[in-house]
Amino acid sequence: RLSLVGSEMCIRDSSKASLSEIQRLWSGLGYYSRARNLFECSMVINSRFNNNFPESEKELLKLPGIGTYTAAAISAIAFNNRSVVIDGNIKRVISRLFFLKKPIKSNYNEIWRFTNLVTPDIRVGDFVQALMDLGSQICKPSKPLCESCPLILKCDARKLSLIHI
């Protein structure tokens, strides 16, 4: 019997389960499309990747329900591959750090380019998680805690007193 609580469910286990069993286990967690994607991913990983979770963004994008952000995040955080990860927090940090003038919502390519410039080749997962934490805890959407920011001396928006971005 499968359980999501108190044990580790491996790809092999989930690929042997039925969709209804995965959905039953998922009950109460919300986002029910994720249960279906988990089931479908396990099938693809079992058949196409011999039960080995793919590590590269390119391979991860072949999995159902995995988009650009999720593929980059898994590749960087789980496998420490150099991937450019961009979530809402990272967009805000990068936009302020380099004082990118276009609105965040319409500036993905420029944000990607600058994020790529600062993404290291080593300890990528640590870097990505640190940027996410920085954006959620210090470089907040409103009332950022600039005085607590480790990047205060490098931040172009702060230098220009334009932290409203």
Where are these regions (language model features)?
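Single conserved hydrophobic/aromatic residue that forms the stacking wall/gate
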Residues: R1-I11, I163-H164
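ATP/adenylate-binding site constellation spanning eukaryotic-like Ser/Thr protein kinases
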Residues: G6, K16-L19, D87
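Short coil/turn segments at secondary-structure junctions
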Residues: C10, L25, I74-I77
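Contiguous mid-protein beta-loop-alpha structural module that forms a pocket-lining wall or clamp
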Residues: S56, I66-L162
